[in-house]
A protein has these predicted regions:
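Inter-helical turn/loop segments and adjacent helix faces that build the functional surface
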Residues: 18-23, 43-46, 68-76
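Basic amphipathic alpha-helical segments that dock to polyanions
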Residues: 31-45, 54
Length: 117
């Protein structure tokens, strides 16, 4: 999966408008057309939109990433991990509010909840 394809899949995963993520990272029309064609060839597109198969693939990537990252947290242990989360979690909403005010509500998609219904 190319970076542009990943952006399109993530847009759909989060319920973002069309091609917002890849465009925000500099993708041009030609790159977007190619990425849509490549996703379509994999069976991930129906009527110009990422379909359920594409969303399932994106979820598989999310699950695999979580699995790979889990080792580091297990190494720290439950107590240290909990302490870390308790330390940093209160700043998340403050950080996102600042991003929203300065860059808009789509920036920092990795920190956003899905808007899909």
């Amino acid at each position: 999966v190319s970076g542009v394809q990943a952006g399109l899949l993530h847009d759909a995963f989060l319920g973002y408008p069309g091609d917002w993520i890849p465009r925000s990272r500099g993708a041009d029309d030609e790159q977007l057309v190619a990425a849509w064609q490549q996703l379509d060839a994999r069976g991930f597109v129906t009527n110009g939109r990422v379909n359920e198969q594409g969303l399932a693939f994106r979820q598989m990537i999310e699950d695999k990433t979580n699995s790979l990252c889990e080792k580091a947290w297990r190494h720290l242990g439950e107590k240290t991990t909990t302490q870390y989360c308790e330390l940093v979690e209160p700043f998340g909403p403050i950080f996102l509010a600042r991003i929203d005010a300065t860059a808009g509500e789509n920036w920092m998609p990795a920190a956003r909840d899905s808007r899909r219904n």
